[in-house]
Amino acid sequence: MNGIHDTGGAHGYGPVYREPNEPVFRYDWEKTVMSLLPALLANANFNLDEFRHSIERMGPAHYLEGTYYEHWLHVFENLLVEKGVLTATEVATGKAASGKTATRVLTPAIVDDSSAPGLLRPGGGFSFFPVGDKVRVLNKNPVGHTRMPRYTRAKWGQWSSTMVCFVTPDTAAHGKGEQPQHVYTVSFTSVELWGQDASSPKDTIRVDLWDDYLEPA
């Protein structure tokens, strides 16, 4: 979707400053939020692409003003209500409804086993593009989740490598199954992406893109 999260090439945000010795966590509550994500994924409350798409659906002002882990907390509070795991009242009060009991005890071993497969998948059909082929990113504006950056659309690049098969985010985020596809690392010149006035015209930008995002030259 064309949202505030997809800001590559946009103006007006200022430089990105790197803070020396930046702490991993600024507040204790951030540690709790981080530990909740693998637990919720292991319990199949939602998948990683649903998680990302929930962040994309945040209001623009909230997205820009919120911190990294505030984005995660927003997902937990909203997606778990959408999934029927929690109620809005439970989220607002911080108290579980009476009579609710856990269905199982989540152990570190369960979390490790559930995360081990990652998003890599076997198969996915044949690879459409041989290495070195020139490819074009489709020019489309999906209203749902996608991993196709807006700044790459309708641009020409060269396929430099294949990263085997992964879960397709565009379907997994919307209850349409994993539908694994090949993922390609596509190289773009900065001039192709940003035009003749690119600030670093000799740069090459490499983007990982799924089969469905590409067409041959």
UniProtKB/Swiss-Prot annotation:
InterPro entries the record matches: CN_hydtase_beta-like_N, CN_hydtase_beta_C, CN_hydtase_beta_dom_C, Elect_transpt_acc-like_dom_sf, Nitrile_hydratase_bsu
A GO molecular-function annotation: transition metal ion binding
UniProt feature coiled coil, ranges: none
E.C. designation(s): 4.2.1.84
Gene3D superfamilies: 2.30.30.50, Nitrile hydratase, beta subunit
Enzyme class: lyase
Keyword terms: Lyase
Applications (biotechnology): Industrial production of acrylamide is now being developed using some of these enzymes.
Catalytic reaction annotation: an aliphatic primary amide = an aliphatic nitrile + H2O
Biological role: NHase catalyzes the hydration of various nitrile compounds to the corresponding amides.
Family per record: Belongs to the nitrile hydratase subunit beta family.
Subunit structure as annotated in this protein's UniProt entry: Heterodimer of an alpha and a beta chain.
Name of the protein in question: Nitrile hydratase subunit beta
Species: Pseudomonas putida
The encoding gene: nthB
